[in-house]
Structure formats: structure tokens, C-alpha cells
UniProtKB/Swiss-Prot annotation:
Domain spans labelled KARI C-terminal knotted: 182-327
Domain of life: Bacteria
GO molecular function: ketol-acid reductoisomerase activity; magnesium ion binding; NADP binding
Record's catalysed reaction(s): (2R)-2,3-dihydroxy-3-methylbutanoate + NADP(+) = (2S)-2-acetolactate + NADPH + H(+); (2R,3R)-2,3-dihydroxy-3-methylpentanoate + NADP(+) = (S)-2-ethyl-2-hydroxy-3-oxobutanoate + NADPH + H(+)
Gene name in the database record: ilvC
Name assigned to this protein: Ketol-acid reductoisomerase (NADP(+))
């Protein structure tokens, strides 16, 4: 069973006298920095000049360039997009690290796949809230928190675990529970969830359902509602009560259809495909492809993205969402809270 830590399990004053640099001020960065500050941690922000720099200053932080922040800090938390981290680390972070410092991540991709090779004389650990930045911030303000993962990659000082748990506590994670894992497990499960279920699997399922209905002659607007729009209703039930709770809340007709038709759609062949996806993650194939794609300025990524944005479900969806201003209101509120992307 996974080991879970709560506030009472974590040593006090571990971060006292230590300066934490949050690198990046996007969705996670703004939440970490504000929560750390309000927990009494000495925190600074490192970010490139621009909107994020101005927003961090507006929020009351001491803001520096990435290089300046890394040079001052005892603990450096890297909260940049995966594809930016390696270049920024090499150019602006690495030389500022001193023996006994801590290099911290919220996702293990670059360390696990050896894009970032930390110095041998620093602690390296991971603290990953299991929720977007606006939720990390909002729950903290409410006196609660979002569960988080932590993992130790390199413990030079003998204090890496204490520092990781103290950091997780300071951003509110230990109010809900901090789960112990490894860089390998966090990275591979996170990528698999994104690719096979949450993003890749789900979008492909939605499009296939939409296309099945429209190709059979049904109106695309109805297909959109049935295969995409109403998804939120079901996901919210699953999020709050699990699969059984969702099934309790839907009609018996829908539940019977779930039981008899769901396995026909997601069958053993699909599961075998999922295993292939997992294998590509585990052996580094996916990581290599993504790294190379970024090195050549993303030709496939950009082409696929442009094509997907003009799929019929998007064209229909844009029109239908104009009929539902409440959808956009929720999006605008979240964007204001989250701040800039990086």
C-alpha cells in the first residue's frame, strides 16, 4: 500500500532559514509561490521578463531573472513546461546551484529521461500536486488542499525527504495527503494517463462517437451534445463519487447500456493497444519522439494540431458554445486565477 503523510507526520521548521525560488509563474508557479509565501516560507520568483514577471510583482513577490533567482536560492523548484526545462536549466539554473542545494520538479520527465542530469552534490526531489494550479490555490485559501505526490531522486544531505514533505505541506498538500512514489512511477503513470485515458484516449473516443452518429445521418449538433457536451455531467459524477456513484445517479437504461455496450467499445484489443502505449513510455520511445519533435520546431505537432482544430466537432462546438455563455464564464474565471501560461 502507498505511504501517505499528513501535516502531523511532517517535521516543523524544515524550511526555516531557506530561500525557495519558484521558476516559472504559470498555473502551478503562481499557486506554489503564493501558498509558500502565506505559509511563512522565504520565497522568490524567477521568470523571464514579460507578463508573468509583471504578474508576479503585482502579486507581491520579489521577482528576478531565472539565473538571479537560482543563484540566491537554497531550494529551486522548476515549474516550466517540460519542453522548456532542459534549455533553461543548462543556460540559467545549473551554474547557480551550490553543494547542498535542492533541485525540485513537479513532474519527473526530464530527470527520468536524462534530459536534465543534476549535479552529484545537490538533493533532487519531486513534489507534484494532483490538480491544476488554480485548484491548488483555491483549496489552500479555503483551508484545505490538493493531494500531492513526492519522490526522492538524489539525497546528498540526508534531508531530501524532510524537505520534500515540508514543501508539500507548505503548499497545502499535506492537508489532503502526500503520497510517496518514485520519479519512474510518477513519470510513467502520468504520461500513460494523459495518452491512453485523459487526453488521447478520451478525445479519440469522443471523435469516434461523434463521427459514428454524423456518418449515420444524425445532425452534428445532437451528436455534439451526446458525445462531448454531456461528458462533463458524467465526469463530474465520477470525480465526486467514483464509477459506482456515477452509475447510481444515471438512469437504469443508461447503466444497462454501460454494462453491455461499454466492453464492446473498449475491449481486449483496446487494452492491448494501451499496453503498447505503456511500453513506448517505459522504453523511452515516446520521450525520444517528443524531444526530437521539439528540436525540429514541431512540424508534426503543428500540422496535427491545425487539422484537429478544424474537425467538424470543433466547428459545430464553437457555434453551440455561443449559446451557452455559462461555459465561457467558467473558463474566464479559471484563466484569471491561473495567470499566464509560463
Amino acid at each position: 500500500m502507498v505511504k501517505v503523510y499528513y501535516n502531523g507526520d511532517i517535521k516543523e521548521n524544515v524550511l526555516a532559514g531557506k530561500k525557495v525560488a519558484v521558476i516559472g509563474y504559470g498555473s502551478q508557479g503562481h499557486a506554489h509561490a503564493l501558498n509558500l509565501k502565506e505559509s511563512g516560507v522565504d520565497v522568490i520568483v524567477g521568470v523571464r521578463k514579460g507578463k508573468s514577471f509583471a504578474k508576479a510583482e503585482e502579486d507581491g513577490h520579489q521577482v528576478f531573472t531565472v539565473r538571479e533567482a537560482a543563484e540566491q536560492a537554497d531550494i529551486v523548484m522548476v515549474l516550466l513546461p517540460d519542453e522548456q526545462q532542459q534549455k533553461v536549466y543548462e543556460a540559467e539554473i545549473k551554474d547557480g546551484l551550490q553543494a547542498g542545494n535542492s533541485l525540485v520538479f513537479a513532474h519527473g520527465f526530464n530527470v527520468h529521461f536524462h534530459q536534465i542530469v543534476p549535479p552529484a552534490d545537490v538533493d533532487v526531489f519531486l513534489v507534484a500536486p494532483k490538480g491544476p494550479g488554480h485548484l491548488v490555490r483555491r483549496t489552500f485559501e479555503q483551508g484545505a488542499g490538493v493531494p500531492a505526490l513526492f519522490a526522492i531522486y538524489q539525497d546528498v544531505t540526508g534531508e531530501a525527504k524532510d524537505k520534500a514533505l515540508a514543501y508539500a505541506k507548505a503548499i497545502g498538500g499535506a492537508r489532503a495527503g502526500v503520497l510517496e512514489t518514485t520519479f519512474k512511477e510518477e513519470t510513467e503513470t502520468d504520461l500513460f494517463g494523459e495518452q491512453a485515458v485523459l487526453c488521447g484516449g478520451l478525445t479519440s473516443l469522443v471523435k469516434a462517437g461523434f463521427e459514428t452518429l454524423t456518418e449515420a445521418g444524425y445532425q452534428p449538433e445532437l451528436a455534439y451534445f451526446e458525445c462531448l457536451h454531456e461528458l462533463k455531467l458524467i465526469v463530474d459524477l465520477m470525480y465526486e463519487e467514483g464509477l459506482a456513484g456515477m452509475r447510481y445517479s444515471i438512469s437504469d437504461t443508461a447503466q444497462w447500456g454501460d454494462f453491455v455496450s461499454g466492453p464492446r467499445v473498449v475491449d481486449e484489443k483496446v487494452k492491448e493497444s494501451m499496453k503498447e502505449v505503456l511500453k513506448d513510455i517505459q522504453n523511452g520511445t515516446f520521450a525520444k519522439e517528443w524531444i526530437v519533435e521539439n528540436q525540429v520546431n514541431r512540424p508534426r505537432f503543428n500540422a496535427i494540431n491545425a487539422s484537429e482544430n478544424e474537425h467538424q466537432i470543433e466547428v459545430v462546438g464553437r457555434k453551440l458554445r455561443e449559446m451557452m455563455p455559462f461555459v465561457k464564464q467558467g473558463k474566464k474565471k479559471e484563466a484569471v486565477v491561473a495567470g499566464a501560461k509560463n
